[in-house]
Swiss-Prot record:
It comes from Chromobacterium violaceum (strain ATCC 12472 / DSM 30191 / JCM 1249 / CCUG 213 / NBRC 12614 / NCIMB 9131 / NCTC 9757 / MK). The keyword Metal-binding does not apply. GO terms for molecular function: 16S rRNA (adenine(1518)-N(6)/adenine(1519)-N(6))-dimethyltransferase activity; RNA binding. The gene is rsmA. This is Ribosomal RNA small subunit methyltransferase A. Transmembrane segments: none annotated. It holds the Pfam family RrnaAD.
Length: 262
């Protein structure tokens, strides 16, 4: 087959470093009967070693040229190809059994894709993703740091996350202009409390971080007032990045009990 030309509109940077590939597969630790879904298999850097360990693998791919290449290289009884956009894909449709999801995620859609994947937290055992290093730093950030934000709160509410591997630009072809890393995400329901209305929690967090430099008192106007915050022992003069995930959950539940809905 002719050499595939990476397509910028799909955010294609193909992994080619053998030690990084081995590190990712080791982290995923696939067992023969696992139901594994790979997002964006590309030229098969992770696909091939996964297939060597699995009875069957599912992949989600949007690029028609890559789909044809995958069909030519792998038998259908080993590889199921789901053609389409991962942002719109129903991962739960693959199997009723627990899922493992892995992928070198396109950096140009990483944040919306992470929010989409987070909705499957109750269907997965773990997820491992290659992402822009700065995105992973936001995912695992601590309160009162510049990286702590909406993405942090909503993902840490659902998952335990760990930055497990640094990946330099030269590990890819073509090399991206940024450093990359690999994150492990393990569902951890209830680790930061349980929201009675997750849509309300999402609304609260989104509004709180709408203007990072403003205080909670200002950002939450129309949703929560100073009295709501003070009732929970939260200083209305704090900025949103100062508030731990647990306090966002407590505030969402307080507002829910007063009749607010997402």
């Amino acid at each position: 087959m002719s050499k595939h030309i990476p397509r910028k509109r799909f955010g294609q940077n193909f992994l080619q470093d053998a030690s990084v590939i081995a590190g990712i597969v080791h982290a995923v630790n696939p067992q023969p009967d696992d139901i594994v879904i790979e997002i964006g298999p590309g030229l098969g850097a992770i696909t091939k070693p996964l297939l060597a360990r699995l009875k069957h693998l599912h992949v989600v791919e949007i690029d028609r040229d890559i789909i044809e290449r995958l069909k030519a290289e792998h038998p259908a009884d080993k590889l199921t190809i789901h053609a389409g956009d991962a942002l719109a894909f129903d991962f739960a449709s693959v199997s009723e059994a627990p899922l493992k999801i892995v992928g070198n995620l396109p950096y140009n859609i990483s944040t919306p894709l992470l929010f989409h994947l987070a909705s499957y937290g109750n269907r997965v055992t773990d997820m491992h993703f290659m992402l822009q290093k700065e995105v992973i730093e936001r995912m695992v950030a601590e309160p009162s740091t510049a990286d702590y934000g909406r993405l942090t709160v909503m993902l840490q509410y659902r998952f335990y996350m760990e930055n497990i591997l640094f990946v330099p630009p030269e590990a890819f072809w073509p090399p991206p202009k940024v450093d990359s890393a690999v994150v492990r995400m393990i569902p951890a329901p209830g680790r930061c409390g349980t929201a009675r209305d997750e849509a309300l929690l999402e609304k609260l967090v989104s509004q709180a971080f709408a203007q990072r430099r403003k205080t909670l008192r200002n950002n939450l106007k129309g949703l929560a007032d100073a009295a709501d915050l003070e009732a929970l022992g939260i200083d209305p003069g704090l900025r949103p990045e100062n508030l731990p995930v647990e306090d966002f959950v407590r505030l969402a539940n307080h507002l829910h009990d007063k009749g607010a809905r997402g």
